Amino acid sequence: MKNILSIQSHVVFGHAGNSXAEFPXRRMGVNVWPLNTVQFSNHTQYPEKWTGCVMXAEHITEIVDGIAAIGKLAQCDAVLSGYLGSAEQGRRIVDIVKKVKQANPNAWYFCDPVMGHPEKGCIVPPEVSGVLCEDALPISDIIAPNLLELETLAGGATLHNVDQCVKAARQLCQQGPKIVLVKHLSRAGFRHDRFEMLLVTADHSWHVSRPLVDFGERQPVGVGDLTSGLMLVDLLKGVELKTALEHVAAAVYEVMLKTKEMNEYELQLVAAQDQMVHPTHNFCATQLD
């Protein structure tokens, strides 16, 4: 069985960061070792309040050192990183990735470069973006930006269409990662009434589209974390790229539908777990080149 060291944020109530990736990945048949960069009461989009703290950067290193001390780091098949509470956390994660790859040269690094949202702008300090662009990108095997994050990683230019996004993703492939998953094309997609994703390698690219699920002004949080977790599991299990993209699009759609059906704000991962593994909907990915 595959093992993923997942270094992300954690919320006690709800599903974001590790709280959105840990259960789905286990339900999909892999072990997840959750290591939290922050621990909050709930995600920060609640207008009322949130409480909690950012974990000290040395805490992250100490935990991984403990795993190494019992001789288990070589069993780690992939490191997944998400929201960073500080730039120093990012630098520590880069060191952890190197340590894991030293213990297991076949291990992957899946970087979810959480910086912000196309509609909401950047939500992390510039120094965090700097660590992601300068340190995490070059050592990643797979990177999964949304549109804003793709623009930032590729140099800051605004991307207006799918062709430009493919070219920007290819630019990232030249800097380190073998695979770029653009989790949400947003305004650069073919259609604004659909949710669109890209999967890009140095030689090929695929596009998939699914219906948007209307939640009004209050969109669920954690969709990107769920997407990254599912994609990593599929790839670790040897699923072909096109098939993995199709499964992830359908699985996330099933979760969104169940969340809408139950009139909830938080992703209903437990209620949708069977459909997440075996989606009833199917969205065919188109190869662009």
Swiss-Prot record:
Substrate binds at S9, T44, Q45, D225. The keyword Lyase does not apply. Pathway: Cofactor metabolism; pyridoxal 5'-phosphate salvage; pyridoxal 5'-phosphate from pyridoxal: step 1/1. It holds the Pfam family Phos_pyr_kin. Its EC number is 2.7.1.35. Keywords: ATP-binding, Kinase, Magnesium, Nucleotide-binding, Transferase. Belongs to the pyridoxine kinase family. PdxY subfamily. This is Pyridoxal kinase PdxY. The lineage of its organism: Bacteria, Pseudomonadati, Pseudomonadota, Gammaproteobacteria, Enterobacterales. The gene is pdxY.
